[in-house]
Amino acid sequence: MSVVPVADVLQGRVAVDSEVTVRGWVRTRRDSKAGISFLAVYDGSCFDPVQAVINNSLPNYNEDVLRLTTGCSVIVTGKVVASPGQGQQFEIQTSKVEVAGWVEDPDTYPMAAKRHSIEYLREVAHLRPRTNLIGAVARVRHTLAQALHRFFNEQGFFWVSTPLITASDTEGAGEMFRVSTLDLENLPRNDQGKVDFDKDFFGKESFLTVSGQLNGETYACALSKIYTFGPTFRAENSNTSRHLAEFWMLEPEVAFANLNDIAGLAEAMLKYVFKAVLEERADDMKFFAERVDKDAVSRLERFIEADFAQVDYTEAVTILENCGRKFENPVYWGVDLSSEHERYLAEEHFKAPVVVKNYPKDIKAFYMRLNEDGKTVAAMDVLAPGIGEIIGGSQREERLDVLDERMLEMGLNKEDYWWYRDLRRYGTVPHSGFGLGFERLIAYVTGVQNVRDVIPFPRTPRNASF
């Protein structure tokens, strides 16, 4: 007799007539007049629970089995048999049931067996992974993360761990969380009356990172192909379905690569992970297509088969200006494209994923390579039907004099970036990279509308519970 996950039983990886033990939680209990109870037991290894058929001849049937309610944890031992009933191929003919943990009061159990609103589930984030929805999201999140690691490993990339605490603002936007151990009641002041960060833990003003990119570039300029994957932080006071204060970013950096190279890399990566999730999480994707977004599976299938369209920003603006559509946000050359603009291009004009390239320099970051026209930079966004921007990237500015000029234009102190500038002084090389917001990717795959519901414990303005 062996302990096996529910997934192994349901997916036929356990031989019929084998004695097994499964461990998990009760989803439902149903009793028949013939003295037989049916327990739906799940352990999170797959979407569906396994049915445990329990005869009233079990010694603890009246004392324990008939008291089991949703959420109780159990250890069930029995024989795997072909199920005569509808809905499952295999079930367990139970010979023993142990109760590992009771639900104290079934009447007040927050995860009672009924459909809960997504807003309610955010209030009980510590229990919401027990629901069908959040459990499925968690498994898809895992599968996507593993697929990303596999893809980059197969492509010869090295994974680099970049710091969460930094003194540099990658985006130059200033929306950063400060890290400090100073006594807020007795802040040290310098001669100008400003807070003296020399007295702080790191001896300077420090922040939570908004991106691992700058640090990643240093390793790309030594290992050639690297990627970072970890949490990043933005102190944006944005209460929208697309924003989190803490979220995960995947950021590859490639030496000797130009904008076209990383556009191709982005396309190959997305198609790889979408194929992986359709193959490995078919049960969860079926649920999303039935209960969340009917297009969840077909959208990914179309994406995998599609040829990416390519368009310059200038041409994209012309398309939008001449399309006859009245947009909520006006479109003209020099404005950053909004979500409605991006979705029009991907969903209605090209009807395919789109790579928009060569944006105006004034709306992009200092590190993006200035094009020969002096007005645009070698930046790109990948726009996906159904969501808009899913990836943003660029060729990095490898010319020190141009980089310094861009920093000056944006009011940045180049001395704060001395180590980043060193890359341009010692064997500089063309290099490129992009960033993928992991939660937006999960939302796109699952059809879940709000990124707060695809990360275990969302951090948003005025909310850091759990």
From Swiss-Prot:
Domain of life: Bacteria
UniProt-listed InterPro entries: Aa-tRNA-synt_II, aa-tRNA-synth_II, aa-tRNA-synth_II/BPL/LPL, Asn-tRNA-ligase, Asp/Asn-tRNA-synth_IIb, NA-bd_OB-fold, NA-bd_OB_tRNA
Compartment annotation: Cytoplasm
UniProt subunit comment: Homodimer.
Transmembrane residue ranges: none
Alphabetically ordered keywords of this record: Aminoacyl-tRNA synthetase, ATP-binding, Cytoplasm, Ligase, Nucleotide-binding, Protein biosynthesis
Family: Belongs to the class-II aminoacyl-tRNA synthetase family.
Encoding gene per record: asnS
One GO molecular-function entry: ATP binding
The name this protein goes by in its record: Asparagine--tRNA ligase
